């Protein structure tokens, strides 16, 4: 009997398919694989270590981070490399350079490359031997360099405190021989600074002894025999940390480093040194708790050499403005401004100001009001001094201002003393003396260019105020309005470009008129509105409003077609025959187009016309445009000049009939592009062609913008330049919360 079994291949083909499940071959998270290499300098830092000839210089190992500690991994690596296990080894990672410990072994990931090296204790012992010997400068430089490389590694620093002492580095700073080697000294200072900043154990900046502070201070005050850039940078940075770190070390620094000795570093060609010196100045002033000492430090910077040093290095013409330097200069200037005398003005100082305006016929009541306001002015003596200086140094300008003011009609004049006080308020706000947004970062070059910056800027503002008052045609009660506009003008001029001195500022203000500022306002308002229109909320609102606006425009256009328009018929030849016209009108049912011949540009419906044609829109195949040139010289509205004129055409293609296989074409011409566009797009919409709607879309977009801008008029948006007012925390916070 023949076998009925199928061949194997056919059986396999007809067997049901079995889905294979994916197999995860990745290692668990706590299992990592990587490589270990032998450090080439292993025997340098551990002289007892021996690398046998059978040692493997690179091995691959697997670490179980849950079960294995650092010591276990070191032993495993040494065993895999055929190294003697009686030596003490360590594992080192690069970028950043650090020793592997039980605390950071969890940070390793698969693919690591570690270096089997000497242990941290061996490193410290060898460094200590070299530094204590002190004979080979090259070896000392290499030892300190290694310490600097590991100065941010707690493992080596702990070993350093365990096997050596920080006094070893302090001795290097004290040693005059070390100061002759710039590389050794600068590296030592950097390493010492990093170790103190790391603050392992109780060793911090307050651990620095006074004689070391004196030695470091000598490097920046000019007492050192020689100066080098890297050493100077390291010393300046260390002194600043000593100022910040502890009250005792701060007092030592203030005694050993007079702030005026730092001025010479500001004019260095290396801007890093100038920046470090400025940063140290600011820290000395900022952290000085003694008010008298702080005022003394500030007054030491109110000198011409300091201003010249800043101008020659950090504010020189043509140099790029470093943001970090600008930040330091602004802080210096804030300190200088804080020392301005804003105490209440004396009676004699107030009388000097009033005497300047004594030539004008002012009532005794006004004079007494001004006297009181000057005595209570927030800028005090600073304001009265600026006013008196304006009268004494610019008497001709003052006479000119008063003369122009007296020629104005009654009610359109400003009063000198109130105007001066308002200009002082503006100047004080720009300088940060009064609440508001200061402009010190933009005024910095101007302030450092003059001995008396406040009176100089005040003088510019007085002239600007007078000119703006005239251009605005302001009246007596509009002092605040003009002042607000003047402040806005100043901010815009300062923002527009970098100004170097008072003369340049005055010239720029002369060219920036009231009308120019109005134009800027309009541009900013338009830009603000455009930004609002592109926000997500407005875009969402725009999408919701669009269908209603489109429907409104469509109905409006159809109503326009129902009123009807006169069009010119296309000319069959280029002869000078009289132009022919016809009147097109959409039926109220929006299903039929009525075309009536007419004699001229105006259509009069007398009700007795026989030449009326009715075209059903269902018989229209397509509506397109077809422009042509009008070469007729006519005085009608279709040709206002003898020159050629472009006529916009509305081309209506009817469906084919038995008589006309291609369908009849009706053409209507007009010089009015808007009229042609409305007819063409509206008829196209009625016959089912919704693609050609450029004119309609433009009108829809314009109406949408108008609608959105009207809606945004009453929406108050937060000003990004002004911080919102945050109310204080209530005294009884629990009852405040429970009330809700």
From Swiss-Prot:
GO MF: enzyme binding; proline-rich region binding; protein-containing complex binding; SH3 domain binding
UniProt lineage: Eukaryota, Metazoa, Ecdysozoa, Nematoda, Chromadorea
Annotated organism of origin: Caenorhabditis briggsae
Predominant location: cytoplasm
Pfam family, one: PH_12
Protein name (Swiss-Prot/TrEMBL): Cell death abnormality protein 12
Task of the protein: Involved in apoptosis and necrosis. Required for the cell corpse engulfment process. Has roles in the formation of actin halos and distal tip cell migration. Plays no role in amphid axon outgrowth.
Keywords: Apoptosis, Cytoplasm, Phagocytosis, SH3-binding
Gene3D superfamilies tied to this protein: 6.10.10.90, Leucine-rich Repeat Variant
